[in-house]
């Protein structure tokens, strides 16, 4: 009983290869349905994101190997010219489980501890379940992976601390002003970086966000998306600087959008009430001399990257704890897999003894009263339970390797003269 994982990710292939081999949700469903309907797989799931496309397959025949699945996906995407098997990784048995646990707990992510991947794994499982491609093995594997991710999030700090510039800026603002909901925020620039910063602010309960941008319609669109509907014309935002506790700049410009003189006047109007300026521009948007002003907190990208580097160091320090959780769950999953392998023998063993019991009781059915027969049946049930306890316990006992399972199964089948499974079914 095998679970194979093959795929490409940020470790094995450049982005152009990952893009070429990725699957949309429609393609995902079509691909795994084809694997099942063609008799190649009992179960199948595909995780497909910008950083990875990975297959998780329970093969239905020995010919379905890792190499076979690589070629099958390449052929499905008609990508033989661009994609080669060397771009793929392969995992088998518990290696597959370990890999999915590492992916789900975000230690295999491009950015260590990036929590978005768990939702993507859950989406992959949902898609597989919707087309009836997730059976007992994948269902147990995925739910164990979800459990691993939950334990990692609650028992370690692998996902704590900002690791993007925009989020680091917001996290810093929250450390200085603990309650962002009470602060008035000006966002200068509604591009990708500014948009991310605004959305992170919104997630931290900041609601009083005013947006200005050279193209007013872009500012209005972002304001509407956030639900603030507060904008300022780019030509006049400097007239209102004194009203804001936090100013975020994220524009493409060769000239400073805020000068030391302008912010000196602003601080006078505010009576030195503290202001945070988060300069997310490259080149810098803000005159660095502003940092010399009293009660003015200025942080640029370099300062924020220093925070990010420290956070990544802290996350890396949590890896031993994460790996310990994964190891514990991997052992439990492996033991569960082993019980599946011995279950047919346990069922056959119980069935044989029940059949013997029923034949022997049938001989006395008309020789004793119903009460006596019931007592005999109760007694024989107890005897059978005790007789079968040790061989069943031996079959279920933890083992060092999967290779020991056939020897145990064969021993029990030979001792109790059980037919081979393929002769019975």
Curated annotation (Swiss-Prot):
Pathway stated in the Swiss-Prot or TrEMBL entry: Porphyrin-containing compound metabolism; protoporphyrin-IX biosynthesis; 5-aminolevulinate from L-glutamyl-tRNA(Glu): step 1/2; Porphyrin-containing compound metabolism; chlorophyll biosynthesis
Q: Which SUPFAM superfamilies match?
A: Glutamyl tRNA-reductase catalytic, N-terminal domain, Glutamyl tRNA-reductase dimerization domain, NAD(P)-binding Rossmann-fold domains
Site Important for activity: give positions: 99
Q: Where does substrate bind?
A: 49-52, 109, 114-116, 120
Named from the GO MF annotations, one term is: glutamyl-tRNA reductase activity
Q: Which reaction does it catalyse?
A: (S)-4-amino-5-oxopentanoate + tRNA(Glu) + NADP(+) = L-glutamyl-tRNA(Glu) + NADPH + H(+)
Domain comment from the record reads as follows: Possesses an unusual extended V-shaped dimeric structure with each monomer consisting of three distinct domains arranged along a curved 'spinal' alpha-helix. The N-terminal catalytic domain specifically recognizes the glutamate moiety of the substrate. The second domain is the NADPH-binding domain, and the third C-terminal domain is responsible for dimerization.
Assembly notes: Homodimer.
More about this protein: During catalysis, the active site Cys acts as a nucleophile attacking the alpha-carbonyl group of tRNA-bound glutamate with the formation of a thioester intermediate between enzyme and glutamate, and the concomitant release of tRNA(Glu). The thioester intermediate is finally reduced by direct hydride transfer from NADPH, to form the product GSA.
Protein name, entry field = Glutamyl-tRNA reductase
What is the protein's species of origin?
Chlorobium phaeobacteroides (strain DSM 266 / SMG 266 / 2430)
Point out the gene that encodes the protein: hemA
């Amino acid at each position: 009983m095998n679970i194979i994982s093959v795929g490409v990710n940020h470790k094995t292939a450049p982005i152009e290869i990952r893009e070429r081999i990725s699957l949309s949700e429609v393609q995902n469903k079509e691909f795994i349905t084809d694997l099942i309907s063609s008799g190649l797989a009992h179960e199948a799931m595909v995780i497909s994101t910008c950083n990875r496309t990975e297959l998780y397959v329970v093969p239905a025949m020995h010919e379905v190997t890792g190499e076979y699945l690589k070629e099958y996906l390449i052929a499905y995407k008609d990508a033989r010219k661009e994609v080669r098997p060397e771009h793929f990784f392969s995992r088998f048995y518990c290696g597959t489980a370990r890999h999915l646990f590492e992916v789900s707990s975000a230690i295999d992510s491009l950015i260590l501890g990036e929590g978005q991947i768990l939702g993507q794994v859950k989406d992959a499982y949902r898609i597989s379940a919707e087309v009836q491609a997730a059976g007992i093995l994948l269902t147990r594997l995925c739910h164990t992976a979800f459990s691993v991710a939950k334990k990692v999030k609650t028992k370690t700090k692998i996902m704590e601390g900002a690791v993007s510039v925009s989020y680091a800026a917001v996290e810093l603002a929250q450390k200085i002003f603990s309650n962002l909901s009470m602060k008035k925020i000006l966002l200068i620039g509604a591009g990708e970086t500014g948009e991310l910063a605004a959305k992170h602010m919104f997630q931290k309960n900041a609601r009083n966000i005013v947006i200005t941008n050279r193209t007013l319609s872009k500012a209005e669109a972002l304001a509407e998306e956030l639900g603030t509907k507060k904008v300022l014309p780019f030509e006049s935002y400097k007239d209102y600087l004194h009203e804001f506790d936090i100013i975020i700049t994220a524009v493409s410009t060769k000239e400073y959008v805020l000068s030391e003189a302008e912010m000196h006047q602003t601080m006078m109007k505010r009576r030195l009430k503290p202001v945070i300026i988060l300069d997310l521009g490259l080149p810098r948007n803000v005159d660095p001399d502003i940092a010399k002003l009293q009660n003015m907190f200025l942080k640029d990208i370099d300062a924020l990257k220093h925070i990010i580097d420290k956070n990544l160091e802290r996350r890396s320090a949590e890896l031993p704890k994460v790996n310990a959780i994964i190891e514990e769950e991997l052992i439990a999953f492996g033991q569960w897999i082993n019980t599946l392998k011995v279950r047919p023998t346990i069922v056959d063993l119980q069935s044989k003894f029940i059949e013997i019991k029923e034949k022997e009781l049938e001989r006395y059915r008309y020789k004793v009263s119903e009460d006596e027969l019931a007592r005999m049946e109760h007694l024989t049930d107890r005897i059978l339970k005790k007789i079968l306890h040790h061989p069943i316990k031996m079959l279920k006992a933890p083992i060092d390797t999967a290779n020991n399972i056939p020897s145990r199964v064969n021993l029990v089948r030979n001792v109790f003269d059980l037919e081979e499974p393929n002769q019975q079914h």
